[in-house]
From Swiss-Prot:
One of its GO terms (biological process) is base-excision repair, AP site formation via deaminated base removal. It is an enzyme of class 3 (hydrolase). NCBIfam families: PRK05254.1-1, PRK05254.1-2, PRK05254.1-4, PRK05254.1-5, ung. InterPro entries: UDG_fam1, Ura-DNA_Glyclase_AS, Uracil-DNA_glycosylase-like, Uracil-DNA_glycosylase-like_sf. This is Uracil-DNA glycosylase. Gene3D superfamilies: Uracil-DNA glycosylase-like domain. Excises uracil residues from the DNA which can arise as a result of misincorporation of dUMP residues by DNA polymerase or due to deamination of cytosine. It comes from Salmonella arizonae (strain ATCC BAA-731 / CDC346-86 / RSK2980).
Amino acid sequence: MATELTWHDVLADEKQQPYFINTLHTVAGERQSGITVYPPQKDVFNAFRFTELGDVKVVILGQDPYHGPGQAHGLAFSVRPGIAPPPSLVNMYKELEASIPGFVRPPHGYLESWARQGVLLLNTVLTVRAGQAHSHASLGWETFTDKVISLINQYREGVVFLLWGSHAQKKGAIIDPLRHHILKAPHPSPLSAHRGFFGCNHFALTNQWLEQHGEKPIDWTPVLPAESE
């Protein structure tokens, strides 16, 4: 089901909610007090900037942003050009090599080209303190991103949700399996990838589903912006 509505249309009311204003206020206060928060302020909402609501075909849920210097830029699992792909992304590339004919692992980990094709790379928590995983987990971000998932569920149809790990899979409760296609696997992190992420075939199954429903499949080879122009 296509929708002409934009993120701005469907999230305007949510962004006026007291909890959301408090979340932004808390994050801004930390930045102003000298605490390093990732990603930079201008990048916090990049997932929505690069993948408009009406273009969403696939959702990949992450947890919170990378907390190392220069990594996070607002797209789950993605890192800026020039930053080495982190272990979870390396394992995603390994699964792509095993399941997508012709996939060649790139030296970078910048996934904007996925986002531009309709893959919403959504972390459930949108900020983190430097070096402190899950440090912003209780700030209210999950209330906001749960709303985002429910809006996709409501306004789109036939979206493929890739839910990796128990945290992401809990979000399956928000998604109507009769309207959308839900694929679950262990998380691609080195701690769990060998428990069933490797061999899950999710990238190939996603493209198979999209093609069966008249959608263009995803080109899973990440391309840097200069290469795609």
